[in-house]
Amino acid sequence: IYSTYEPPENSDPLEVVAMGHQWWWEFRYPDEGIVTANELYVPTDRPVRITLQSQDVIHSFWVPQVAGKKDTVPGNTNVMWLQVDEPGNYSGQCAEFCGVAHARMRFRVIAEEESNFNNWMESMKTPPRMDTSEGYGLFLAHCSMCHSIDSYNEGSYEKELTMQDERWDDWYFNQEESVRVSAPNLTHLGIRTMIAAGQKDMTKENLIAWIKDPSEFKRGTRMQSVASVYKGGPAKLEDY
């Protein structure tokens, strides 16, 4: 049993940090400088070493079809590894009660053949087409306090880690008046397969409904209590 604690020697495991948040998962690829959320892309036939951490309370990382479960504990670091041999999507779930939205703290492991995985990594490092639309301006005005969309920029990885800590401190120490909180990195959100930590498939209709009234999807989400666009109830998207 002990011999399986670490990936096989000379196997060149992919390094990933899985950070638990109430109630979503952040996935960091430190060697590639990539930060994303709720969808863990991995190559097939290659070990993946996962460093498990938590920003707030105890969570538990669990992908039933692929690996066992292990806790993420604030102030501590746990490690596990997994290997997926067949391409496909594998459902994951927080397996430790962590608050009101625990049952909706889902994620997805997306296993791709190595060439496709490498293509995904390259796409995450590629800037999107610059958008000067009103929607982009609204995102910068209202959403960028909590969400980042620039993981492709040089130095963005270190910046994102610092910003997440600062956002958390702002909210934790001033929950009544804070205007920001830790939130998923949304770089290249459009290529994701799901939204709201696995509550709905990624479609235009679901995305609009999620932005308009997050609590209808996921009770307890802090987005609606913090972001100014929700003051007084659901966002009035028709105004925009």
Where are these regions (language model features)?
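Non-transmembrane, membrane-proximal soluble domains of secreted or membrane proteins
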Residues: 1-144, 148-181, 198-212, 218-240
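"…together with the soluble PPM/PP2C metallo-phosphatase catalytic core" -> "…together
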Residues: 186
